[in-house]
């Protein structure tokens, strides 16, 4: 029986929902189950064969009917509308009490019991283990191995399997159904099996974001991320989760933990130790079964720093997250001869010989890995369950008392204090050298007083909680922020009345997030800045790149105003049971009057887009003004109150939780408002899909911007002004020179196929933006009145069109400029603070400073003639230490470098966004820079900046 999943809201409902499972045990346990070969016509792992998602679902339904060990549930829909399924596999006896097992794990995970009861629940309990596959769809092993694993767990009756089924509840989930369907169909479409390939798929293998689907798990923009997180952090609470990936390091078969440093300082040490233990179980079982070629730690670049992957988010929820990266493809692959992988060492204990590696062998390796995890989860289920409780208890205790998180900046502060003491002692005649004081070899350690005065400085203690005031200008975005926390299982409260904490009064409706909760690590990681260590292998060496970004706390990047509270506090707070919408407030406009929406509010653009679509008038104020006792900044939106506009305004305000004021007269004076008009937007993309373009596509859809995707062939054909008013080029679209290739291919990687090798429907998307052919057409477009918005590397267009700018990140060597070497400058994926000229219409609604995301991004210096040509800086780095979260080696080189440039070109406008203002659709705090740019060129009369001083020239 195939059952639609129903979320259990209480134990009684859970038991009622589980009642059909008891009936299911009456099914025949000795009946033969359909094998993959009987279902599909081949064994899983056969050369040149892949199962697609439609076939997978049919097979799961059949096994669900045949087996008393498995129940299939739907956990939600994908972005393309497919059902996402989880197979719950355990013994028939456990199926009878599934609700009780689930409830016991919930109580342990949330530390809702005392230690004695927790130990009893752990002794009597069952480990819940999540195993997934297929997240990155061109990594086809992950999805296919899941089919084989499900079949074996339902059919094998050896003692180990029976013990595993008795001690564990296994959640097998295919986490990118849309991608599996696309890639498998693409591979199998080729009639000549020897020509089959997973390369060259025509679009992203997740509808919007391709490979970045594994970077979305704290933000949860995509439905697949929401589905998985709900299961793991709000419903089932697995003790271990296992995320299958490809491909293994060259010269090896697979990577499995332990991971390399650094690990994130927010999560419990039991996480790191648990990862190492489970990873060691994988390596040990592989070696025992004669499966060589597994590496660990420095054998690959993976770490546990970044929160946003499906397995890394688990660390901040007290779950042991395991990643493997394994080679294997239905088209046989070859293990290359890599000399460094042949000498055994701690991180490469069991080298493998080079040679052909079959897909079936990769399946067997994957099943071994699964069994290694399930075996240790079974044998040590009491430890895993109690440790899950213990980590939750530790988190609650840490949030309930003074606590200090030690990170590199605190160590550096202590080091400076010790060196200062040592220098003072040396001047006084005491024989205390700096090396001894710092704990060097032969020394007696550092002065203990420094531990208390610096590492435990009372001013530097962790917050007991955070308050997000409801009177901040963009409260709807603040509400989106707390909703991401709620969707990740974090407890959030809302004030039912005004209250005072630490002498400051907060209005009703403010959000409160206390640190004393089981998922405290996630709370701290989302609010507090990351402090990544200087990962430099030797003095003077180049920094070792992180696996992903280093600074990402969304309280900063979303532009949230919040307060850190260092002491315990309470107030008139109610716990929010689920995601919320901010309270809307619409003040009626008098007859002949107008509505005003604050320019700070991102969701104002939803209202603007709906109104313009309905052919209603919208304008923007060009100077600050006051209505009903409330101050509004320049750029605020003015909407004449009509029978047509009023219901649109009221509806969008209710949906988004916006405040809308009614007023009698539209402000004019010396700065009359400018009228907006609907614009025709073209968003660049190319064959295979661009992840930055996909993210932007999703963002435009959420804020209801009308747009068309435009491909290089259309751009090269010219006559662009007849089709578009605004063109948007994301990172990776416009090269600096024609030898440079943009992104493309499956998931946003790789090259493009020959036209005659792909279906005709995809051929119009082939091609690249080129300096020689495309840029001249873009020049015509902007000179004839169009607006071009460029992001990241696509700001190269500024150089192509001759703007008076130069690269800020260069040095002069032997009389010639060259990019700063990595030994001197390296800023990988961090949050920096930038100054903003918010008198410029491009920055309407922004504060005078902003947190911006920066990932080795372009930065500019303006030439002396820039001002005369109307080229203006909109954002720049004002100082030698702009880093606010992450890692910035050599950040002093950014001092006064310009991040955002606005320039007139002919009758049109060109905007250079050096930093990625919509990176992975996380930095809500800079979205409006992009949105303002879309309407900037169409405003009539054209708005202009009102401030001309205090900006870099």
State each model region's role.
Residues 242-243, 728:
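N-terminal Rossmann-like NAD(P) cofactor-binding module of classical short-chain dehydrogenase/reductase
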């Amino acid at each position: 029986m195939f059952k639609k999943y129903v979320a259990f809201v209480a134990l009684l409902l859970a038991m009622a929902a589980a009642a059909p499972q008891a009936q299911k045990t009456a099914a025949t346990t000795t009946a033969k189950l359909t094998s993959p070969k009987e279902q599909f016509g081949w064994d899983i792992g056969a050369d040149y064969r892949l199962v697609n998602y439609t076939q997978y679902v049919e097979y799961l339904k059949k096994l669900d009917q045949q087996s008393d060990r498995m129940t299939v549930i739907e956990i939600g829909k994908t972005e393309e509308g497919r059902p996402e399924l989880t197979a719950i596999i355990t013994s028939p006896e456990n199926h009878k009490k599934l609700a009780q097992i689930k409830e016991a794990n919930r109580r342990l995970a949330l530390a809702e019991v005392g230690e004695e009861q927790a130990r009893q629940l752990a002794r009597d309990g069952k480990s819940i283990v999540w195993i997934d596959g297929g997240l990155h769809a061109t990594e086809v092993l992950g999805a296919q191995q899941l089919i084989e694993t499900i079949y074996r767990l339902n059919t094998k009756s050896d003692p180990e399997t029976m013990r595993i089924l008795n001690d564990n509840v296994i959640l097998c989930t295919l986490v990118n159904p849309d991608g599996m369907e696309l890639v498998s169909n693409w591979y199998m479409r080729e009639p000549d099996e020897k020509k089959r390939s997973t390369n060259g798929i025509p679009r992203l293998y997740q509808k919007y974001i391709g490979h970045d689907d594994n970077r979305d798990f704290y933000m949860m923009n995509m439905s697949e991320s929401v589905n998985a997180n709900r299961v793991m952090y709000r419903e089932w609470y697995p003790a271990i989760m296992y995320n299958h990936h490809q491909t293994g390091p060259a010269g090896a078969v697979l990577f499995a933990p332990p991971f390399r440093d650094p690990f994130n300082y927010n999560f419990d040490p039991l996480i790191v130790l648990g990862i190492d233990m489970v990873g060691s179980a994988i390596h040990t079982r592989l070696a025992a079964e004669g499966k060589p070629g597994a590496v660990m730690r420095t054998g690959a670049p993976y770490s546990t720093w970044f929160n946003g992957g499906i397995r890394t988010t688990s660390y901040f929820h007290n779950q042991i997250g395991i990643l493997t990266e394994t080679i294997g493809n239905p088209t046989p692959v070859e293990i290359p001869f890599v000399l460094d992988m042949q000498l055994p060492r701690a991180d490469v204990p069991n080298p493998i010989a080079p040679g052909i590696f079959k897909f079936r062998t990769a399946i067997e390796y994957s099943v071994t890995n699964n069994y290694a995890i399930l075996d240790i989860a079974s044998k040590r289920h009491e430890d895993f369950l109690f440790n899950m409780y213990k980590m939750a208890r530790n988190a609650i205790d840490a949030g309930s008392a003074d606590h200090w998180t030690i990170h590199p900046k605190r160590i550096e502060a202590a080091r400076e204090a010790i060196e200062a003491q040592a220098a003072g002692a040396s001047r006084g005649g005491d024989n205390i050298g700096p090396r001894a004081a710092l704990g060097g070899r032969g020394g007696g350690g550092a002065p203990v007083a420094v531990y208390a005065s610096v590492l435990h400085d009372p001013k530097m203690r962790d917050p007991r909680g955070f308050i997000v005031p409801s009177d901040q200008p963009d409260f709807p975005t603040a509400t989106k922020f707390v909703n991401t926390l709620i969707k990740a299982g974090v407890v959030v409260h809302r004030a039912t009345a005004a209250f005072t904490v630490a002498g400051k009064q907060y209005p009703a409706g403010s959000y409160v997030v206390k640190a004393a909760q089981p998922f405290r690590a996630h709370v701290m990681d989302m609010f507090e800045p990351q402090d990544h260590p200087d990962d430099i292998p030797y003095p003077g060496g180049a920094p070792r790149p992180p696996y992903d970004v280093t600074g990402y706390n969304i309280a900063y990047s979303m532009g949230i105003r919040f307060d850190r509270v260092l002491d315990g506090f309470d107030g008139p707070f109610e716990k929010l049971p689920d995601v919320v919408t901010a309270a809307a407030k619409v003040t009626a406009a008098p007859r002949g009057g107008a509505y005003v929406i604050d320019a700070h509010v991102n969701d104002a653009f939803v209202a603007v887009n709906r109104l313009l679509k309905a052919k209603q008038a919208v304008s923007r104020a060009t100077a600050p003004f006051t209505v009903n006792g409330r101050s509004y900044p320049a750029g605020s939106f003015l909407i004449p109150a009509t029978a047509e506009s009023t219901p649109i305004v009221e509806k969008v305000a209710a949906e988004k939780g916006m405040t809308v004021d009614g007023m009698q007269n539209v402000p004019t004076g010396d700065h009359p408002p400018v009228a907006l008009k609907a614009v025709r937007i073209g968003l660049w993309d190319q064959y295979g899909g661009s992840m930055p373009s996909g993210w932007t596509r999703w963002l435009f859809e959420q804020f209801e911007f009308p747009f068309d995707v435009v491909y290089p062939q259309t751009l090269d054909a010219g006559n662009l002004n007849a089709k578009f008013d605004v063109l948007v080029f994301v990172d990776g679209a416009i090269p600096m020179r024609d030898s440079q290739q943009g992104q493309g291919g499956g998931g946003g990687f790789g090259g493009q196929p020959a036209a005659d090798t792909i279906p005709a429907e995809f051929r119009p998307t082939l091609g690249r933006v080129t300096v020689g052919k495309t840029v001249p057409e873009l020049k015509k477009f902007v000179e004839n009145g169009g607006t071009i918005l460029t992001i990241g590397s696509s700001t190269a267009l500024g150089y192509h069109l001759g703007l008076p700018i130069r690269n800020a990140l260069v040095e002069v060597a032997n009389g010639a400029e060259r990019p700063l070497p990595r030994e001197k400058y390296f800023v990988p994926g961090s949050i920096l603070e930038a100054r903003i000229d918010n008198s410029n219409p491009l920055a309407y609604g922004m504060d005078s400073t902003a947190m911006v995301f920066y990932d080795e991004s372009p930065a500019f210096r303006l030439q002396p003639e820039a001002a005369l040509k109307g080229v203006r800086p909109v954002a720049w780095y004002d100082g030698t230490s702009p880093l606010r979260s992450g890692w910035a080696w050599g950040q002093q080189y950014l001092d006064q470098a310009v991040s955002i440039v606005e320039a007139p070109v002919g009758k049109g406008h060109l905007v250079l966004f050096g930093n990625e203002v919509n990176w992975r659709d996380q930095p809500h705090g800079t979205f409006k820079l992009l949105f303002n740019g879309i309407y900037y060129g169409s405003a009539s009369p054209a708005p202009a900046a009102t401030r001309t001083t205090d900006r870099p020239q």
